[in-house]
């Protein structure tokens, strides 16, 4: 969500007059959430600006004991651990899109997964279990990769990517 707050010297510490939540859909990635939050912020600042300018807004101090700090996400955190459950992996793919992105390696090359959904196949974690790049995960789950980007190349739908790919059913990806 977003908060309408006074700016003070410390990061995110000013008093808040209003806070708004955003309903998230399962298929939202970080980029989509950022876009939605930007639109919500633009709308809500307009709703609050008159009260703020006329000193009618009621600002309340934040409870600083509940404050948290998110450290910078490092590129290496995008490496997929196929032993994790499919929902966790899809969460990582969506949460790290577009930058730094969630990725795997095959034959020394990096592949960024841009979009994926839950699959229904079973195999060993990291094993490609279909000709359409469905990959086995932990908990006897799988994900279907829908869009991918090979290092240094343009993004591709999986049907297009698989035409020239060396990643085949039975391959193990890391």
What does each of the following model-derived ranges do?
Residues 71-72, 78-80, 87:
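Active-site loop ensemble at the mouth of alpha/beta enzyme cores that anchors a bound cofactor
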Residues 1-70, 76:
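Donor/substrate-binding cores of folate-linked one-carbon enzymes
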Residues 23, 79, 151:
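Short, flexible active-site loop motifs that bind/organize anionic cofactors or intermediates
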Residues 72-74, 95-96:
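A short catalytic or substrate-binding loop motif that flags glycine-/basic-rich loops and adjacent residues
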Residues 83-174:
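An anion-binding loop in the catalytic cleft
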């Amino acid at each position: 969500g977003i908060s309408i707050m006074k700016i003070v010297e410390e990061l995110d510490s000013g008093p808040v007059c209003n806070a708004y939540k955003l309903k998230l859909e399962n298929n939202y990635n970080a980029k989509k959430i950022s876009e939605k939050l930007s639109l919500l912020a633009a709308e809500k600042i307009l709703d609050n600006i008159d009260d703020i300018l006329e000193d009618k807004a009621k600002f309340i101090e934040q409870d600083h004991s509940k404050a948290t700090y998110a450290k910078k996400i490092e590129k290496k955190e995008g490496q997929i651990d196929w032993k994790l459950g499919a929902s966790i992996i899809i969460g990582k793919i969506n949460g790290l899109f577009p930058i730094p992105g969630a990725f795997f390696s095959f034959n020394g090359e990096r592949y960024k997964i841009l979009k994926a959904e839950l699959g229904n196949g079973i195999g060993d974690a990291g094993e490609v279990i279909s000709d359409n790049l469905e990959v086995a995960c932990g908990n006897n789950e799988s994900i279907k990769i829908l869009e991918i980007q090979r290092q240094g190349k343009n993004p591709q739908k999986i049907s297009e990517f698989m035409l020239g790919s060396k990643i085949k059913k039975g391959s193990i990806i890391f």
